[in-house]
Structure formats: C-alpha cells, structure tokens
Amino acid sequence: MKLLDSAYDHCEEGNYAQALKCYDEILQNDPNNIKALVDKATTLQNLGKLKTSIKFYEKALKLDPKNIDALTNKGSALHTLELYPDAIRCYDEALKIDKKCAMAFAYKGLSLGEQGKEKEALKFFKKALSLEKDYDIAQISKNIAKDLLKSI
C-alpha cells in the first residue's frame, strides 16, 4: 500500500511522471490491482492521454464492472473526446449501481448539454444538487443551462 500512497502524494504535488512510475511498479507485481489501474488511468487522463486512460479504465472494469470511479472517469474521458453518447452510457451504468451518485448525474447533464439537450441536462444538474447541494459543477452548469433555455 505504500507505493499507492506514494503515487497519490506525487499526483497531489503535480509530479505525474513519478506517480506513473509507482503505478507501473504496482501493476508489474499485481496486474489486477484495481485501485492502481483506476488511479493510473486518472493520472493519464489528467495528462491529456485520454485514449490510454480509457484503456486502463476498461481493464479495471473487466475486473470490477461495478467500479463507480472507473465508470464515471471513463465517461469523463469520453466526454472530453466529444463521444457524448458513449460517455452517457458510462454514467447510466454508474447510476444503475449507485442511484445517488451526484457526479454521474452532473456529468450526464454536461454530456446532454453538449448535445444541445439543455432542458434534459437541467434535470440532471438539479438531481445532482438535490444529492449534494454544494456541488460546484452541477450548480454552475445548472445556471448556464437555465440561461441558455431563457435565450431560446
């Protein structure tokens, strides 16, 4: 567990290359370490290596199909690649597992909004806020969606 803690500390300090070395060492010894797979994927995503990060999320999901972090983060990477329907499928899968996942609701709202479905997106932002009232992404996005709907 020390290497995972060390990798986390490196990420917090913005030293992603060193964090990736830690994850590689963990995965060399334990290729099925779900935490290391998801955290490595997240680190790669933070570095803008989206397609590679998605591959690591998929490895983690093969081992643990109900991993909420892997599902929502994979959805986020797909969203960044503008693959909104694929992203929404990830969020829907996460919501089947955890009906109170504010992040999945908010992120689904973002993907819907990018598809021009502001009215539907607004419902998801409101749901995210009903679960987590101080959720910044949902609040900001809700306000933007409302403004867009007023301008139509």
Predicted regions and their residues:
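Register position in tetratricopeptide repeats
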Residues: 12-13, 46-47, 80, 114, ...
